[in-house]
């Protein structure tokens, strides 16, 4: 089952009521996304072998919060949503939507915010990005969107992605439409931008017990039923792995049919779990899944494959 985004004026009253029952999409609410992520990363850094890198990621998340408010985005996406709906495409499709210079402005603002906090190799990386031409930055962005990770060094990718993600999240939060679930394929990709998830989460509150995949780019969440592979939609050979016990808040859901896995986080086990932070902090579980022969079906925005990986 795929999810299409229907323009507000094309939704009948019955569709509006149905959409309110089980929301197929949760558009990003940017008010506290980045601060909460930064706080969780810092918390998880304590007594974690990856503590230094988690604190580094927290600096980037905090910078995103600052830049978000320094550079708000105003854009009318009504026409874009209608066009994408007619074409059956995500409205902010990363492979189609032209990028304007706003994302590069965000990148340079992130660099300015981060430079006082960086030293050594990390400082050299952002200084190198600061000197890059607009064309070079666009080429790196296009390579990341095409999953051509060999063309962008893994130390530059998190900074480029942080700016792109902030830009796409700003756009996604402005979408003036509702979502309707329709039968189809490709539920493994974000219905808003076409990127992949970072992890999935079984939620509490108004969406109690429902699983949502969290986009690694635009921060949108979309509903996928539980006990079904989020990558191939099969359900006959699923297994759940953890490094702790059955009550663990972070598990990996593996599929024997397609040979992939995705992290699944449980808010009922730990209300503070965060899609990006807890995924990054549990890389030991990723190593275990690789040993078991499973490939990751997602990418964390702070950890990109390097050349040859």
From Swiss-Prot:
One function term, GO molecular function aspect: ferric iron binding
Entry keyword annotation includes Cytoplasm: yes
GO CC terms, sorted: cytosol
Transmembrane stretches, start-end: none
Subcellular location: Cytoplasm
Record's keyword terms, sorted: Cytoplasm
Gene Ontology BP annotations: protein maturation
SUPFAM superfamilies associated with the record: FdhE-like
Family: Belongs to the FdhE family.
Biological function: Necessary for formate dehydrogenase activity.
Full protein name: Protein FdhE
UniProt organism field: Salmonella choleraesuis (strain SC-B67)
């Amino acid at each position: 089952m795929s999810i299409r985004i229907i323009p507000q004026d094309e939704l009948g009253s019955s569709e509006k009521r149905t959409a309110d029952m089980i929301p197929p999409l949760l558009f990003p609410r940017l008010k506290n996304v980045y601060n909460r992520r930064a706080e969780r990363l810092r918390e998880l850094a304590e007594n974690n072998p990856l503590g230094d890198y988690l604190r580094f990621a927290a600096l980037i998340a905090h910078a995103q919060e600052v830049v978000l408010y320094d550079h708000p985005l105003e854009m009318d996406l009504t026409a874009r949503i209608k066009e994408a709906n007619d074409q059956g495409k995500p409205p902010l499709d990363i492979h189609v939507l032209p990028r304007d210079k706003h994302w590069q402005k965000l990148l340079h603002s992130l660099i300015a915010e981060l430079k006082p906090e960086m030293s050594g190799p990390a400082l050299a990386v952002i200084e190198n990005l600061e000197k890059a031409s607009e064309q070079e930055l666009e080429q790196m962005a296009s390579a990341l969107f095409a999953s051509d990770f060999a063309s962008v060094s893994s130390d530059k990718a998190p900074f480029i992605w942080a700016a792109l993600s902030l830009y796409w999240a700003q756009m996604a939060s402005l979408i003036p439409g509702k979502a309707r679930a329709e039968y189809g394929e490709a539920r493994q990709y974000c219905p808003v931008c076409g990127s992949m998830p970072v992890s999935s989460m079984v939620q509490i509150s108004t969406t109690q017990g429902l699983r949502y995949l969290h986009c690694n780019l635009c921060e949108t969440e979309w509903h996928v039923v539980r006990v079904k592979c989020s990558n191939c939609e099969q359900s006959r050979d699923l297994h759940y792995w953890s490094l702790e016990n059955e009550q663990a808040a972070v598990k990996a859901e593996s599929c024997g049919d397609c040979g992939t896995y995705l992290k699944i986080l449980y808010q009922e086990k730990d209300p503070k779990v965060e899609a990006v932070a807890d995924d990054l902090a549990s890389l030991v579980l990723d190593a275990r899944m690789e040993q078991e022969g499973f490939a990751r079906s997602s990418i964390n925005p702070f950890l990109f494959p390097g050349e040859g990986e």
